Swiss-Prot record:
Pfam families, sorted: YbaB_DNA_bd
UniProt lineage: Bacteria, Bacillati, Bacillota, Bacilli, Lactobacillales
A GO molecular-function annotation: DNA binding
Its job: Binds to DNA and alters its conformation. May be involved in regulation of gene expression, nucleoid organization and DNA protection.
Protein name: Nucleoid-associated protein LBA0378
Organism of origin: Lactobacillus acidophilus (strain ATCC 700396 / NCK56 / N2 / NCFM)
Length: 111
């Protein structure tokens, strides 16, 4: 019968469960702070020539949208729709990039 190695109550490379929980709570607090920082920021997406400008909060809520009055053409609603989609997508992409840059260091290797 083989004996199991004795790690003196320690596991995971010498770190006990209490230390692991303390470290996990510390990381959780750091991640929450990073998320709060992102949420407090504003992100602005702009279409070509700034004809449509969409402003978001960091929690992905649309706060404002500005449409250049010369862009509104009743005969071409598709162009305005495309400009709005472009501005909104650019704003959301900025939030995603900021989130990845800020929180990616915590999730690296988990996915």
């Amino acid at each position: 019968m083989s004996r199991r190695p004795n790690f003196g109550g320690m596991g995971m490379g010498g770190m006990n469960m209490q230390q692991m929980m303390k470290q996990a709570k510390k990381l959780q607090a750091q991640m929450a702070e990073e998320q709060e920082n992102i949420t407090a920021q504003e992100f602005v997406g702009k279409s070509a020539d700034d004809l449509v400008v969409a402003t978001f909060s960091g929690d992905r809520k649309l706060k404002d949208i500005k449409i250049d009055k010369d862009t509104i053409d009743p005969d071409d609603p598709d162009m305005l729709q495309d400009l709005i989609i472009d501005a909104v997508n650019k704003g959301l992409s900025q939030i995603d990039e900021a989130t990845q840059a800020s929180l990616g260091k915590y999730t690296k290797g988990l996915m």
